[in-house]
Amino acid sequence: MGIIDGSLLRRLICLCLWCLLGGGVTVVTAEDEKKVVHKQLNQTPTWAVAAVCTFFIVVSVLLEKLLHKVGKVLWDRHKTALLDALEKIKAELMVLGFISLLLTFGQTYILDICIPSHVARTMLPCPAPNLKKEDDDNGESHRRLLSFEHRFLSGGEASPTKCTKEGYVELISAEALHQLHILIFFLAIFHVLYSFLTMMLGRLKIRGWKHWENETSSHNYEFSTDTSRFRLTHETSFVRAHTSFWTRIPFFFYVGCFFRQFFRSVGRTDYLTLRNGFIAVHLAPGSQFNFQKYIKRSLEDDFKVVVGVSPVLWGSFVLFLLLNIDGFKMMFIGTAIPVIIILAVGTKLQAIMTRMALGITDRHAVVQGMPLVQGNDEYFWFGRPHLILHLMHFALFQNAFQITYFFWIWYSFGSDSCYHPNFKIALVKVAIALGVLCLCSYITLPLYALVTQMGSRMKKSVFDEQTSKALKKWRMAVKKKKGVKATTKRLGGDGSASPTASTVRSTSSVRSLQRYKTTPHSMRYEGLDPETSDLDTDNEALTPPKSPPSFELVVKVEPNKTNTGETSRDTETDSKEFSFVKPAPSNESSQDR
C-alpha cells in the first residue's frame, strides 16, 4: 500500500556504509552463504580497520565538540538552567553508554546462561512460531542485504549454542542482544531530539507573551488599569472569560476547562491578571517587573526536571518490556497513558484559573482597578504544585519511549512484524504521540510555568543569577560565622534558596529589596529592576566588572512597639561577602517606610 518496508531503511544505511568503505561490501545471498569466511581482526586489511576506526572517531569527536559548543554558548549567555539541563542530557547519554559497554563485554557470559525450554516459551511478545513452517520459509528465502550477520555489533559471528543439555536453550541469543543494543542507541538519539523539541516549543510559546509584557509599559495600559476606577466584578475581562452560569455546575465546569486548553489556554487578559496578582502579592505594587522574562527563567528551571531520567522512569521502561506480552495490548496502554495524563493536567491548570476567577466573585461585588487574584497551593492536587511537573515528566518520558519503540521495531523487524499487525494503526499511534509532544510542550508546560506562580511560595527564579548567587554566598557566610543556632536570625527563615528580606548594593549596580508587612502568606519587594539585573537577554551578555565589587547588605524591618536601639551598618569594601545588619527602630527607618 505504498508503505516503506523497514528493510529499505536498513538497505539505505548499508548503502551509505558501502560508499564510505569504497564499495568493498557485497551482497550475500543464501546460495553464497556457505562460501563466506568470517575473518578475525588479524586477517583483516589494516586500511579497512583504520577506515572504520577513523569514521567512528571523527563522528564521536564532532558530537562531543557540538555539545561543548552548545554548553559554551549557554554559559556565555548566562543560561544556567539550560546549562544544567545539558549536563543532565550528557549524564543520561553516559548511562546509556555504560549500558552499551556492559552489553558488549557481558555478551559472552550472558550467552552461557541456559534455561529450560518450556520456560523460554513463556511471556513471549509474539506468538510462538511453527517450527516446521519456519524451516520451510528459511529454505526458500534469501538473505537480506549483508545478511543478518552484519547486525552483530560485538559478536562478530553467530556462534553456536553452548547449551548442550537436552531441554535447555539460551537465555537470550546473540542476535537478540544486538537488537537490544540497537534499542539503547535509539533511546540516546531520540532522548536528545525529544528534549530539544520540548524546550524549543515551550520557549516559542512564552516568546509570544513578550508583546503583552511590553504593553504594560505603555500609557494606554496605565489608563486601562486605572486603580481609582471602580467596576462590578462580573464586568471585568478575567471574570467574564472564565465564569458563566455553567461554571457553577461541576460537570460543565470540567468540560469547559477541558476544551479551553485547546483553543485559548492563555489569553491576554489571563496573562495581565496573573501578572498583576503576582506583583501585588510578592512585590511592591506598581513595580516595573518583567514578568515574561521571569516566566521564561521559571520554564528553564522546570525543564531541568523534565529532561532527566530518574530511576522511577527507568523502572517504568523495564516494566513495559516485561509486560509487553502477546495479547496484553501493552503498546496501546503505553500510548494512552501519556495522553490521559497530559489532558488531565491541562484540565486541572485551566480549572485553577477558573477557580481563581470564581474566588474573586465570591469575595467582592465591586473591584477597584484590575481584579486581584489570590493564589494558593490548595488549588493544586494534594497542595503540591510540583506534583504536576512530575506527572508531565513521566508522561513525556513514556511518550518519547513509544516513539522510540516504534522506529526501533520498524528498523529491526520491518513494518509487517507481529509487533505491528496493522501498520496503519501504528502510524496513527505515532501521530498521537507527536500530538501529545506538541500539546505538552507548547501549551501545558508554559501554562504550568504561569499558573504555578499563583502558589503560596515564590520561586527562586524571581532573582537573576548574579543576585541569587550573592544572596546564597551571604547566607553561607553568616552560617559559617555564627553557626546553626535556634536563635539565629536567617534570611529566608525556612532555609529556602530564596531569601525573603534583603537589600543588596554593589558598586557596579545597585539592587535594593525592602521587606514590608503584608498578609501572612505573602512577601512584597520594592525596587527590583529586572531590566538592569535580568541576565536572560536575547542578544547581549553581561561583562564582569573591571574592579572587584563591594557589596553592602541592609536588612530593614518595621519596628515593633517594644524595639529600641539604633540601626547599625557594616560595610566591607574588599570582600564579596555580605555583612549582616541588626536592625533597630530609628528615624531613618521610619522615613524609609
Swiss-Prot record:
- Tell me if Transferase is a UniProt keyword of this record: no
Q: Which gene encodes it?
A: MLO8
Pfam (any one):
Mlo
Instruction: Say which species the protein is native to.
Output: Arabidopsis thaliana
Compositionally biased, Basic and acidic residues: which spans? 567-579
Q: Where is the composition biased (Acidic residues)?
A: 528-539
GO biological process, alphabetically ordered: defense response
Show the ranges annotated as biased composition (Low complexity).
489-512
Put simply, this protein is called MLO-like protein 8
GO CC terms for this protein?
plasma membrane
> Which GO molecular function annotations are given, in alphabetical order?
calmodulin binding
Q: Which UniProt keywords apply?
A: Calmodulin-binding, Membrane, Pathogenesis-related protein, Plant defense, Transmembrane, Transmembrane helix
Q: Quote the record's domain comment.
A: The C-terminus contains a calmodulin-binding domain, which binds calmodulin in a calcium-dependent fashion.
**Which residue ranges are recorded for the region named Calmodulin-binding?**
465-486
Q: Which residues lie on this side of the membrane: Cytoplasmic?
A: 68-92, 203-304, 348-393, 452-593
